[in-house]
From Swiss-Prot:
<keyword id="KW-0165">Cleavage on pair of basic residues</keyword>
<comment type="function">
    <text>Induces neurotoxic symptoms on zebrafish. Has also been claimed to be implied in calcification, but tests on homolog proteins suggest that proteins of this family have a neurotoxic function and not a calcification function.</text>
</comment>
<dbReference type="GO" id="GO:0042151">
    <property type="term" value="C:nematocyst"/>
</dbReference>
<keyword id="KW-0528">Neurotoxin</keyword>
<comment type="similarity">
    <text>Belongs to the Cnidaria small cysteine-rich protein (SCRiP) family. beta subfamily.</text>
</comment>
<keyword id="KW-0800">Toxin</keyword>
<feature type="signal peptide">
    <location>
        <begin position="1"/>
        <end position="23"/>
    </location>
</feature>
<dbReference type="GO" id="GO:0090729">
    <property type="term" value="F:toxin activity"/>
</dbReference>
<keyword id="KW-1015">Disulfide bond</keyword>
<keyword id="KW-0732">Signal</keyword>
<keyword id="KW-0166">Nematocyst</keyword>
<keyword id="KW-0964">Secreted</keyword>
<protein>
    <recommendedName>
        <fullName>Small cysteine-rich protein 6</fullName>
    </recommendedName>
</protein>
<feature type="propeptide">
    <location>
        <begin position="24"/>
        <end position="25"/>
    </location>
</feature>
<dbReference type="GO" id="GO:0005576">
    <property type="term" value="C:extracellular region"/>
</dbReference>
Length: 81
């Protein structure tokens, strides 16, 4: 019985890992950001865009501690680094 449970847990963990890899982990986990981060400012430096759209030129997805409303993510002005 313990072997079956261990196999099932490995399968579930593998499925979650593959799902994260397929999504590219480009978008942050909003629950983590809301707990530990700060809200996106919606200014010229950073603003929210719909989840399945791209950041405009000269902007990129913000670091992981920025969050927006549900189904949106934060774009920040590209720093050039």
């Amino acid at each position: 019985m313990d072997t079956k449970v261990a196999c099932l847990l490995l399968i579930i963990l593998g499925a979650l890992t593959v799902q994260g890899a397929v999504s590219g982990n480009k978008r942050i986990n909003p629950l983590h950001a809301r707990q530990w981060g700060e809200q996106c400012m919606n200014s010229m430096e950073e603003f929210c865009v719909p989840e399945y759209s791209e950041c405009p030129p000269e902007y990129e997805p913000c670091r992981e501690d920025k969050y927006c409303e549900n189904d949106y993510y934060c774009c920040c002005r590209y720093s050039g680094y």
